[in-house]
Amino acid sequence: ISDANVATVTGSTTTIVGAGTTSVTVSQAADDNYNSATATMTLTVSQADITTATVASISDQTYTGSAITISPTVTFNGSTVTETTDYTVSFANNTNAGTASLTITGTGNFTGTKTVSFTIVKAAPTISFNDVSKTYGEVDFNLSATSSSTGVFSYTISDANVATVTGSTTTIVGAGTTSVTVTQAADTNYNSATATMTLTVSQADITTATVASISGQTYTGSAITISPTVTFNG
């Protein structure tokens, strides 16, 4: 066989090595009545259909925000074949959570295409929700969490004696410490998740309160006590 990249021969047993065309020469020794002689034929080995190859199952992939690429394990007749040499790989719908596809296209000894699917699962979002310190008497404020997800936030406060929340608007009720939990709904690419921070409300300084003017008192011979009118923030 003239091209060992196409086939090899041992005795008369021929082993196919790769797709292509080669000449095969047979030489026959002389006998009592005939001279020695040769003859040549052409051996053509066609490319194999890549659809008959096996692509190993692809495990679920987690959403990253970027296109996900995988080097698949491909076998043909029980032997592993090599990317670039035997096939190329392309992808579709391989960024967002859902069903993505991988297509192998035969090269070299293979022809045709084969497509398999794999799943991109939602990721856990990264939520930033920092502790907050306030002083009793401060005006309402908005809770503000940030996240890699676009899911809607909802907030709960564990101790209504410290603060209450409507939507994200938080009203201070009294001095103390409470935990605040944010829950974020799932979106297209992220699962739902929660995060917790601590809200600390310090006591207000009574010197900022207003004591109403006290009218003159008349001597009684006894200690005079008064219940003052004290206002804070109006």
Regions found by a protein language model. Name each.
Residues I1-G234:
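Solvent-exposed beta-strand/loop surfaces, strongest in extracytoplasmic domains of secreted
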